[in-house]
């Protein structure tokens, strides 16, 4: 406030100063509002860590107003079942995405196309049955991937191509029966692989993956137990402990399949045979060609007892041969020592024993002198 005796000029200058301060304050407020990212409704946002927590809210869709600078987005424990391909568009700064404990059954091919800086992806406990081979192609920095507790029956070839930074991978509790070694070849820096609680069929289809597991363990990778479900002889046994003799029949099976491929192929078969046409009255029914698929012969591996028996017999034979070699060496040493002792005693007796021819000549000389 101005003093009562102030001049009109002073009052004008003071009003102008207040007007300038007001304009500056308004501009600062507007800039602060524009710079402050909006937080989705009912979600919790941390401006320091750039984390948006929308977990446990019963969401059926991804909030559309997630700030573009978000680095961590938590969407676990919701009711997400189907996501559009643009659900995470313009979130190129996102590093961690958690979609665990939802009802997702499929993921669009390009849903993670903008997540070029993603390092951790959690998809645990969903209903995912299939994955597109290009799903993770645009996330080369991914380090941790959790696909456990889903309905995956197979992994498409090329799914992990380009994921050189991947350190841990969880495939536990799915419906995987076998895996292709080529699918895991690009994971040169993988350190932890979890594949337990799957219905593994330890047959020829898993032979190459067994070789890869041995190489993975040799270079220091950590791998949980891969327990066989089939065949019955191997049920509950760790795949890594199965002798390689169990897979000797695989080469024979491949030879049989290759030789069978040289035959002239017949008509394509169908799983369900079509219904036979009704014959006309008075006409004899014509035999219809069979279109049912022949049942594929299932080759079962050799018995575990037979393989173990072979190993035991080989060990016994090697042991017997070693014992015989030790006995022969001992006998040779004893014989050599006895012969050496005999020769020493013989040398000692030679000076004491006279020459019989010399004694006979001496007797002749004595008789001649006499």
From Swiss-Prot:
The keyword Transferase belongs to this UniProt entry's keyword annotation: no
Signal peptide bounds: 1-35
Glycosylation-annotated residues: 90, 117, 125, 257
LRR repeats: 69-90, 93-114, 117-139, 141-162, 165-186
Annotated gene: LRTM2
Region ranges (Disordered): 261-300, 351-370
Membrane topology (Extracellular): 36-310
Membrane-topology annotation of the record: Single-pass type I membrane protein
One GO term (biological process): positive regulation of synapse assembly
PANTHER family in alphabetical order: ANTIGEN BSP, PUTATIVE-RELATED (PTHR24369), LEUCINE RICH REPEATS AND TRANSMEMBRANE DOMAINS 2 (PTHR24369:SF175)
Native organism: Homo sapiens (Human)
Keywords: Glycoprotein, Leucine-rich repeat, Membrane, Repeat, Signal, Transmembrane, Transmembrane helix
Annotated TM spans: 311-331
Membrane-side (Cytoplasmic) residue stretches: 332-370
Cellular component, GO, one term: membrane
Compartment(s) of residence: Membrane
Domain LRRNT: 36-68
Claim: Manganese is one of the keywords in the record: no
Segments forming domain LRRCT: 198-252
Protein name: Leucine-rich repeat and transmembrane domain-containing protein 2
